[in-house]
A protein has these predicted regions:
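Bacterial N-terminal signal peptides that target proteins for export
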Residues: 19-31
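Bacterial N-terminal signal peptides
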Residues: 29-40
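Active-site-proximal loop/helix segments of hydrolase catalytic cores
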Residues: 169-242, 253-259
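N-terminal amphipathic/basic-hydrophobic helices that include classical n-h-c signal peptides
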Residues: 1-21
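Intrinsic disorder/low-complexity segments, especially N-terminal tails and targeting/processing regions
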Residues: 12, 30, 43-44
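Metallo-beta-lactamase
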Residues: 41-169, 177, 196-199, 218-222, ...
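Generic recognition of flexible, low-complexity loop/linker segments
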Residues: 1, 279-280
Length: 297
C-alpha cells in the first residue's frame, strides 16, 4: 500500500481503517500500563496478610492431605530444648536462639534472661507486674478492660498465639466464685515444625470451639494439681482429646503422678527422666503418646 502524500485526498474507507488501528494501539498501551501498575500493587497487598498458623492449617486439612507422620517429611529436623524450671514455668529454647518462659513470675533466676515471657493471672505465682525491663516481649494472657487477649506474633523463628479461656474470681472485688470470661489464655508456640501448647492455669473444660482454635498439638504442658486448676478427671479428659505425642506435667504440688496416669488411660506411656531438659524435634516425637516427667516435676 502506497503511503498518502501531503495534500492527497484520503478515501473514507482508508481513513476509517487508520482510525481503528490507532484505537487498537491505544487499547494495547492502556492494558500494558494497567498490568504494570497491578504488578506493583499486588505484592504490597500480599505483605498485609495476617500471620498463618501451620498448626491450625494441619488440623483443619482434609485427611488425605495430612501426612501419616509429619516427622517423616523433613530431611533434617531441628531440635527444640524444653526445660522444667518450676511450678508452671518451662523454658523453650528454639533452634534460632529464642528463649521463651511460660507463666513467668520472675522468681526463677538463670544466667540468661528469656526473650519472650507469657503470663496467666490466676495467682501471683503465674505472673509479675514488674518483669525485667530488658525482656523484650511480655505477653499477657488477659486483655484490658474485660476484653480477651489477642496474641499473634512472630519472634525470630517462633510464631506465638493464644486461645482465651475463663478464670475463677479469687481475690478482692473478683472474689465472687463466678467465672471471668476470657480472663486467661492457653499459649501455643509453633517452631521447627512442632506445635507446642501450654494450658496455663486452666479452670474449666474445653468445648469444641476451644479445641478448634487450638488445632494440632505435638507437645502439651498440663496442670495436674487437681485442685486449684481443675479436677484430675477433667484435665485427663482434655489431655486425651488433644492427642499430643508428648505430655509434660506441671503445677503438680503433692498430686501423685500415678493418679494422673491412671486417669488418662493405658494408651499413654510414661517416661521418667533424670534430667530437667527434653531435647526434641518433629522427627524424634514418640510413636506412642507419652507422658514425659522431667526432673523436678
Amino acid at each position: 500500500m502506497t503511503a498518502a502524500k501531503f495534500g492527497d485526498t484520503v478515501p473514507p474507507a482508508a481513513f476509517a481503517a487508520m482510525g481503528h488501528a490507532m484505537l487498537r494501539s491505544l487499547n494495547v498501551s492502556l492494558a500494558t500500563a494497567l498490568a504494570f501498575l497491578g504488578s506493583l500493587i499486588v505484592p504490597a497487598s500480599a505483605q498485609q496478610q495476617p500471620l498463618r498458623s501451620e498448626c491450625l492449617a494441619m488440623a483443619s486439612a482434609p485427611p488425605l492431605a495430612v501426612p501419616v507422620s509429619l516427622r517423616r517429611t523433613a530431611a533434617k529436623a531441628e531440635d527444640v530444648a524444653i526445660t522444667y524450671v518450676g511450678h508452671s514455668t518451662y523454658y523453650i529454647d528454639t533452634p534460632g536462639g529464642v528463649r521463651i518462659a511460660t507463666d513467668f513470675n520472675g522468681a526463677y533466676r538463670t544466667e540468661r534472661l528469656p526473650d519472650v515471657i507469657t503470663m496467666n493471672r490466676a495467682h501471683s505465682t503465674h505472673y509479675t507486674l514488674f518483669p525485667d525491663p530488658k525482656i523484650p516481649h511480655v505477653l499477657h494472657g488477659w486483655g484490658e478492660n474485660g476484653q480477651a487477649a489477642h496474641v499473634s506474633t512472630r519472634v525470630g523463628d517462633v510464631y506465638i498465639r493464644n486461645v482465651p479461656t475463663d478464670i475463677r474470681r479469687y481475690y478482692g472485688e473478683d472474689a465472687s466464685g463466678a467465672m471471668l470470661k476470657d480472663g486467661n489464655s492457653i499459649f501455643i508456640f509453633e517452631v521447627a515444625g512442632l506445635c507446642i501448647g501450654h494450658l496455663g492455669h486452666l479452670h474449666h473444660k474445653l468445648d469444641d470451639t476451644h479445641f478448634a482454635a487450638i488445632g494440632r498439638l505435638d507437645i502439651v504442658m498440663v496442670p495436674i494439681d487437681g485442685t486449684y486448676t481443675m479436677s484430675l478427671d477433667g484435665i485427663s479428659d482434655i489431655t486425651r482429646r488433644l492427642r499430643a505425642s508428648v505430655v509434660l506435667p506441671m503445677h503438680r504440688f503433692m498430686t501423685p503422678l500415678d493418679e494422673f496416669m491412671r486417669r488418662i488411660g493405658q494408651q499413654f506411656e510414661i517416661d521418667r527422666r533424670g534430667e530437667g531438659t527434653l531435647t526434641i524435634s518433629r522427627e524424634s516425637l514418640p510413636a506412642t503418646p507419652t507422658v514425659i516427667i522431667l526432673n523436678g516435676v
